[in-house]
């Protein structure tokens, strides 16, 4: 593993389904984050890194749907779904990543990211985005908690 992090906040809604928690935490991007992601997509496209559009970022996550492993959950593929955790992510030629949203018994919500790079482009990309990633994930989780969504 080339990178691993975890952020956690208290849960105000311990009975909430993990898909709803995922949507509450990751489905409410501030406008500046959307702009950064779209700019990143344009810059990385020549390297073969698939990006996102404003349309991709505007689509809400359907929390009423029953998701199965292999389905798209938001922008990423669902790799695992359990009562208290879902894992999404994406694999490409430069790096693979996973995002875990876990509800523990305390009750707390833990959002973790794991990244495995495959080549120099993946390592360079990871090094470039890490400061934004750390700030962004902490902000998304904190905002979701402060707003009472999780």
Task: State the predicted function of each range.
Residues 115-136:
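A short acidic/glycine-rich loop-to-helix N-cap element
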Residues 139-140:
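Glycine-rich, low-complexity intrinsically disordered segments
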Residues 102-121:
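Short acidic, glycine/tyrosine-flanked loop/strand segments centered on an H-E-D-like triad
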Residues 1-58:
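Hydrophobic ligand-binding cavity/cleft-lining segments
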Residues 2-8, 85, 108-110:
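Intrinsic-disorder/low-complexity, polar/charged segments enriched in Ser/Thr/Lys/Arg/Asp/Glu/Gln
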Residues 145-150:
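Short, highly charged C-terminal tails/helix-capping segments
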Residues 48, 52-70, 74:
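Helix-adjacent hinge/juxtasegments
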Residues 65-105:
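Hydrophobic-ligand binding "helix-grip"
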């Amino acid at each position: 593993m080339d990178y691993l992090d975890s952020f956690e906040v208290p849960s105000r809604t311990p009975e909430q389904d993990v898909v709803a928690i995922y949507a509450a935490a990751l489905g409410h991007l501030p406008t500046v984050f959307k702009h950064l992601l779209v700019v990143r997509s344009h810059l990385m496209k020549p390297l073969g890194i698939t990006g996102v559009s404003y349309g991709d970022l505007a689509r809400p996550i359907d929390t009423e749907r029953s998701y199965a492993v292999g389905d798209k959950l938001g922008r990423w593929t669902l790799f695992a779904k359990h009562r208290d955790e879902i894992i999404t992510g994406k694999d490409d030629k430069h790096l693979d990543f996973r995002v875990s949203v876990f509800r523990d018994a305390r009750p707390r919500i833990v959002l973790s990211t794991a990244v495995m790079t495959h080549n120099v482009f993946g390592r360079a990309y990871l090094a470039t985005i890490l400061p934004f990633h750390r700030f962004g994930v902490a902000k998304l989780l904190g905002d979701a908690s402060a707003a009472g969504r999780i």
